Regions:
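Anion-recognition interface
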Residues: 1-365
Length: 365
């Protein structure tokens, strides 16, 4: 039976890629120290989709939530389950998840980031998940209260209440994301301190980032999503085609040429919402790793919106993207040809070797 289970449930875009990369790279060291990461990163993601019963989940899931929970319960030490998609679970689904891990001591871990950085990264994540709405439309919907999913699934206060109310206050943990310029290991040490991971146990490589797209690259992807129509409606096919061949191989490699963000016309609104969030979290009984002041936006400067790009800028980026995809296709074709030649050479060597052996045996007769 597991002693403690740490459920790191979100929020998205709070450094989870870096934290999870450290965890999975050091899973053997963690296991030797009595800390289990059940399944794999993909298995935990599949289990999340099963728990939430999302429409884009794979139909033939091997790793259901019940299977992951059983794996966790069967470990005699501590267990870590980390997937930022868990934060989007409903209250009923969250309760099911916690109950499935009993009688272990379940801890809930939620990370929070300032809203000035959260808003553009959330829109971009939606674009990279096949959405097609404009940045301005997204911001307007959030501001008018017409997109409650943002507050439920991408901010710490509501997520922490939905999950944290299921466990005692001493088992609710809020990690604040350090501001830009902080040492890259600060976030990791905050997580490690909560989960009881000894200092120095895990090797920290250069932080694995989930780089943002520039304004033009994001706009190209948004228009591609619209043009796809009903093709690749499920997440896995979309990831294997669009995410792999367009986003990861080309768009993310271009660098963030033109950064974008919330305009200064909404700065006062963002600051007000941040103060409300800080007040609510200060009043909620939980353990804070970091400082709630880090949720207060700083360095709010004017930036352009992808909506402001003219068609010429988007066309130039699209053409450059097509050229890069052709180069990528050529590289893949070259590797495939080389692989074919290597396999063919091995087959010929085996055939020639077999023929020579048979000839030698025939000669001895």
């Amino acid at each position: 039976m597991a002693r403690r289970v740490f459920l790191h449930v979100g929020a998205p875009k709070t450094g989870s890629t870096f934290v999870q990369d450290v965890l999975w790279r050091n899973r053997r060291e963690l296991k030797r120290a009595g800390i289990l990461l059940p399944g794999s990163a993909r298995a935990q993601d599949a289990a999340m989709t099963d728990l939430r019963q999302v429409p884009w989940r794979d139909a033939d899931l091997r790793w259901t939530w019940d299977r992951l929970a059983a794996k966790a319960r069967g470990w005699p030490g501590d267990v870590i389950i980390s997937n930022e998609g868990l934060g989007g679970a409903s209250s009923v689904q969250a309760a099911r998840a916690v109950e499935s891990l009993l009688p272990a001591e379940v801890h809930i871990v939620v990370a929070g980031r300032d809203l000035w950085r959260t808003l553009p990264s959330t829109w971009q994540q939606s674009i990279r998940a096949r959405s097609g709405w404009r940045f301005g439309a997204f911001l307007g919907a959030v501001e008018r209260g017409e997109f409650d999913t943002f507050w439920e699934n991408y901010t710490a206060n509501r997520m922490l209440r939905r999950w944290g109310d299921l466990v005692p206050a001493e088992r609710r943990h809020l990690v604040t994301v350090p501001p830009p310029g902080a040492p890259h290991d600060t976030l990791w040490h905050r997580f490690a301190g909560i989960m009881g991971i000894p200092d120095g146990l895990c090797e920290l490589a250069a932080p694995t980032s989930n780089p943002s797209l520039g304004a033009a690259e994001a706009e190209v992807l948004r228009r591609v999503n619209l043009a796809l129509g009903d093709r690749y409606p499920l997440r896995r096919p979309y990831q294997e085609v669009v995410q792999r061949h367009l986003v990861d191989s080309v768009l993310r490699q271009r660098g963030n040429g033109l950064r974008f963000g919330v305009g200064l016309d909404r700065a006062a609104w963002v600051a007000d919402q941040a103060e409300r969030q800080i007040t609510e979290l200060r009043d909620y009984p939980c353990q804070v790793a970091g400082d709630l002041a880090e949720l207060r936006p700083t360095g709010m400067t004017q930036s352009r919106s992808p909506d402001e790009l003219d068609d010429g800028q988007v066309l130039t980026t699209a053409i450059e993207t097509i050229v890069a995809m052709l180069e990528q296709a050529e590289a893949l074709s070259t590797r495939a040809d080389r692989r074919y030649e290597e396999i063919l050479a091995r087959v010929r060597a085996r055939v020639d070797g077999g023929v020579r052996r048979r000839l030698r045996r025939a000669g001895r007769r």
